[in-house]
Amino acid sequence: MDPFVVLVLCLSCLLLLSIWRQSSGRGKLPPGPTPLPVIGNILQIDIKDVSKSLTNLSKIYGPVFTLYFGLERMVVLHGYEVVKEALIDLGEEFSGRGHFPLAERANRGFGIVFSNGKRWKEIRRFSLMTLRNFGMGKRSIEDRVQEEARCLVEELRKTKASPCDPTFILGCAPCNVICSIIFQKRFDYKDQQFLNLMEKLNENIRIVSTPWIQICNNFPTIIDYFPGTHNKLLKNLAFMESDILEKVKEHQESMDINNPRDFIDCFLIKMEKEKQNQQSEFTIENLVITAADLLGAGTETTSTTLRYALLLLLKHPEVTAKVQEEIERVIGRNRSPCMQDRGHMPYTDAVVHEVQRYIDLIPTSLPHAVTCDVKFRNYLIPKGTTILTSLTSVLHDNKEFPNPEMFDPRHFLDEGGNFKKSNYFMPFSAGKRICVGEGLARMELFLFLTFILQNFNLKSLIDPKDLDTTPVVNGFASVPPFYQLCFIPV
């Protein structure tokens, strides 16, 4: 058959498939802009700032609406009420993970971030239990974070109060905490193996944040037939998995079943207990991918939040002064901060919360999916439909947070200066898919920041009023603009 005829037939089939998918069930789905064949609503979305586009569309179609990214149908949730109703009140029905062709290629359905069903539930339950087990290797997770915080302070001392970009050092600290939990080992910041790991993690975040990856996920045929950065992403992930597998083999040879040292040991012990169960989800494949998931999810998000926190503290020296006064009063100079201190430091706690609220790190979270046909607000959402959640619409709700575009710790303080919780605080998402490392991340943010401010004054290279804190939105995360500062020993 003539190649031209084959091409026309293929394009015609794709067009018909697109029209059929977009028209099927439209009477039951939430409203939304009319999609174009094949490309859907992509032309109506700013790929570099999806969150802003969703906010604009919500003003037209309401808090629940339908979009098509290519052939992929998505239902968008915008605003606290619908997000709570879906992710919390109907948590089980909305607990699936959205379709990610690239991740599915890399992870093969294993791990904790992109798995679904029984596998996801069992691996998540085990990971939560293990991360909360403060007795691994007779050292609590808090001990590990405190140790890394001391190392971080010593690295900052080496800058000798000269101007520096904190990106690298602030990236090393949370990565080392995860390494300590998974591998029972922290690395020197100049260790070549550690630097290679950091390089792969950072490069992957840069790649994932590009519009090209959005295109690959919406048109998965590209993955096999086109060159691009997605190939580098898959190569980096394969490198990390190979490295983790080597460490798993080392653990198998040296493990003491009665004295687990780290996450890998705990997983291997669980595998041993379930070795007679042919349906067990505790396999080497799941261990390797879960460890890679924890490394990827637990490094860049925390380091970016820390980097943004220091920029905001530079911009608002009056806030920094209040935090340091609270540190001096509650902790002093002669001991290290600990998590028990947080309950006695409402202002510092409010500042950490406000940093996370203000920066809105992951504006749309990772997409969910419905696990069955769901009736939601008089609409029928078919099983498997991807759910896109606007966390921006919750964290920047102007009824809950007056002047949401302003950095103001009073958003989390009552009139008496006591810490005030808010149900709208969802930087880790909400419901059954809430970030498994939430507790660890909150511990790291509090301890790293208090250790830094206990030991250093922060000095800006320019007038604080002239510092730009506008986030650089890159399609996946909101990151701070480049800046330098000086760490002046107190």
Curated annotation (Swiss-Prot):
The answer to whether the entry has keyword Endoplasmic reticulum is yes
Where does the UniProt annotation locate this protein? Endoplasmic reticulum membrane; Microsome membrane
Its chief place of residence is endoplasmic reticulum
* UniProt cross-references to Pfam families, sorted A to Z: p450
**GO cellular component annotations of the record:** cytoplasm; endoplasmic reticulum membrane; intracellular membrane-bounded organelle; plasma membrane
**Annotated positions binding heme:** 435
Concerning InterPro entries, the annotation shows: Cyt_P450 (IPR001128), Cyt_P450_CS (IPR017972), Cyt_P450_E_grp-I (IPR002401), Cyt_P450_sf (IPR036396), Cytochrome_P450_fam2 (IPR050182)
Give the consequence of mutating residue 120 to R. Answer: In allele CYP2C19*8; loss of activity
Which keywords are on file for this protein? Endoplasmic reticulum, Fatty acid metabolism, Heme, Iron, Lipid metabolism, Membrane, Metal-binding, Microsome, Monooxygenase, NADP, Oxidoreductase
* Enzyme Commission number(s) from the entry: 1.14.14.1, 1.14.14.53, 1.14.14.51, 1.14.14.52
Q: What does this protein do?
A: A cytochrome P450 monooxygenase involved in the metabolism of polyunsaturated fatty acids (PUFA). Mechanistically, uses molecular oxygen inserting one oxygen atom into a substrate, and reducing the second into a water molecule, with two electrons provided by NADPH via cytochrome P450 reductase (NADPH--hemoprotein reductase). Catalyzes the hydroxylation of carbon-hydrogen bonds. Hydroxylates PUFA specifically at the omega-1 position. Catalyzes the epoxidation of double bonds of PUFA. Also metabolizes plant monoterpenes such as limonene.
- Name the PANTHER family for this protein: CYTOCHROME P450 2C19, CYTOCHROME P450 508A4-RELATED
Which protein is depicted?
A: Cytochrome P450 2C19
Per the UniProt entry, what species is this protein from, by scientific name? Homo sapiens (Human)
- Give me the gene this protein comes from: CYP2C19
